Amino acid sequence: MLKKTPETVSDSDDAEERGSERRHRIHPLTIIRRIFGNAVFSSLTRRILFFNVAATVVLVGGILYLNQFREGLIDARVESLLTQGEIIAGAVSASASVDTNSITINPEKLLELQAGQSITPAPNDEDLSFPINPERVAPVLRRLISPTRTRARLFDADANLLLDSRHLYSRGQVLRFDLPPVTPETQTWGDWFTSMFNRMLQPSSLPQYKEAPGGDGSIYPEVMNALTGVRGAVVRVTEKGELIVSVAVPVQRFRAVLGVLLLSTQAGDIDKIVHAERLAIMRVFGIATLVNIVLSLLLSSTIATPLRRLSAAAIRVRRGARTREEIPDFSARQDEIGNLSIALREMTTALYDRIDAIESFAADVSHELKNPLTSLRSAVETLPRAKTEESKQRLTEIIFHDVRRLDRLISDISDASRLDAELARADASPLDLDVLMKGLVDISRQISTKKKSVAIDYVADRKAGAKTSFVVNGHDLRIGQIVTNLIENARSFVSEESGRITVRLSRHKDRCIVQVEDNGPGIQAEDIDRIFERFYTDRPASEGFGQNSGLGLSISRQIAEAHGGSLRAENVVDKYGVISGARFTLSLPAAETHER
């Protein structure tokens, strides 16, 4: 059994802490995926639908949660009940019967009252007594309350219940009472959902409504305030969550409070109106969601479908190794998908071109390597049958020559094969061609003392009075390789006695031009384009066979094109139309487009 040492325990604790830290750094999108499942996010169409519908749900939820319709409706109902209560209280006060034999009115006390002060008698003050006669008030209260669904209760000066509109019946009225169910009511899922929905949208805590036991109105704060002459309103909620709005209005006669009129809405009246308003919002939400889904599907068809076609085409390109697969063309869209389509088409074309180039290069390499190998094989097979020392010496020289030729070919092929990768990895930097050309010409002049001695001139064409910039972005070694190849190529074709090579640097708009011109025999018209082909050689008779691989000009053009430039060849013709030499022109994009 493996026992944990303190070191292993501490290491495991550190690992657990690091794992805990990684768990705490979970991306929010990962959390959403865990909640809703990966299926929601497995397709761009489903993502568009999910986020668009989610945005609509959040919007409607915010509207329902922050909607002020309910509060406005409650305020309007309070004002309506207060106005209605003032009218009913005035009618009740006018209908109250006063027994003048048992009332003593002190005029001086009336004159001592201030504005707004009530003459409600104190418990030990029996100077003023205005009793309300329920029998005379009941018909008036019933007629005023009947057109509305408002409940009215009348309390006397001691907050005792005198009348309740629930128990006021007119003559001939048929009474109907709902009996309680035989079995207790069970809450359905619909009722539970509605209750939870209302609780979420009505988070404010309201006092619970209770019936006054024994008609004692003192449990209602608004009734007690009304006994002091101040009207008030209170909003309560029943056990079922239904709203009840109550207002208390003092019943006054001769500025004396005779009692209190308490008006209350029926439980659920306001909730029904709010529910209807929310139902209308939900209908609009349903229509908006349906429209959102349709628009999301249309949006998905314009985004996901083209992307799906591009993806399928890319897979066909990967699998179709022998045939050229066509990438769908969405360039007419003129948007990001159109740009992606153009990029994929160009990338695919470049890929196929590269495949063709590799196949062609492999075929050329195979062909070029077979020639020296065939010669080498023949020499090796013939060497044992050679009878004279002279024949053996000549065959040995052929073998050495073919080996050197193979070595040169393999080196040039290796250089050409890794050229693209090297240019892709290396970072281009600003390079002054004027400085580079001067250095290359100086080196070539020094080489002339060891090889064929020819005159090499360098000319930088600048505008009068201006300092022309010859700066380009590139790789100095590779651009130097182009110019060196052109100079050495020209050296091989000019005569040693009168040979001359001119390197000229100039600027044309946003291009830097390097020209290498010689006074040799020129180029055959049919060979001007072929000289840039791989392994093509057309060397002067003075050079031995196999001294050149034929890759120099091909590599030079490849380097120029990798820098966004070009390399071309032409003949120099004098005024008589006679070819007087060859000219190679290297064009590179300038790093700056202005002159300073």
Curated annotation (Swiss-Prot):
Enzyme class: transferase
Disordered: annotated span: 1-22
Domain Histidine kinase span(s) in chain numbering: 364-592
GO-annotated cellular components: plasma membrane
CDD domains xrefs: HAMP, HisKA
Catalytic activity: ATP + protein L-histidine = ADP + protein N-phospho-L-histidine
Subcellular location(s) per record: Cell inner membrane
Gene3D superfamilies for this protein: 1.10.287.130, 6.10.340.10, Histidine kinase-like ATPase, C-terminal domain
Membrane topology: Multi-pass membrane protein
Bilayer-spanning residue ranges: 48-68, 284-304
Molecular function via GO: ATP binding; phosphorelay sensor kinase activity
Keywords: ATP-binding, Cell inner membrane, Cell membrane, Kinase, Membrane, Nucleotide-binding, Phosphoprotein, Transferase, Transmembrane, Transmembrane helix, Two-component regulatory system
UniProt cross-references to SUPFAM superfamilies, sorted A to Z: ATPase domain of HSP90 chaperone/DNA topoisomerase II/histidine kinase, Homodimeric domain of signal transducing histidine kinase
Residue ranges annotated as Cytoplasmic topological domain: 1-47, 305-596
EC number: 2.7.13.3
Residues bearing PTM Phosphohistidine: 367
Residues on Periplasmic side: 69-283
HAMP domain span: 301-356
PANTHER family, per the entry: SENSOR HISTIDINE KINASE TRCS (PTHR45436:SF5), SENSOR HISTIDINE KINASE YKOH (PTHR45436)
Function: Member of a two-component regulatory system ChvG/ChvI. Activates ChvI by phosphorylation (Potential).
Protein name per the record: Sensor protein ChvG
Protein species of origin: Agrobacterium fabrum (strain C58 / ATCC 33970) (Agrobacterium tumefaciens (strain C58))
Lineage: Bacteria, Pseudomonadati, Pseudomonadota, Alphaproteobacteria, Hyphomicrobiales
Gene this protein is translated from: chvG
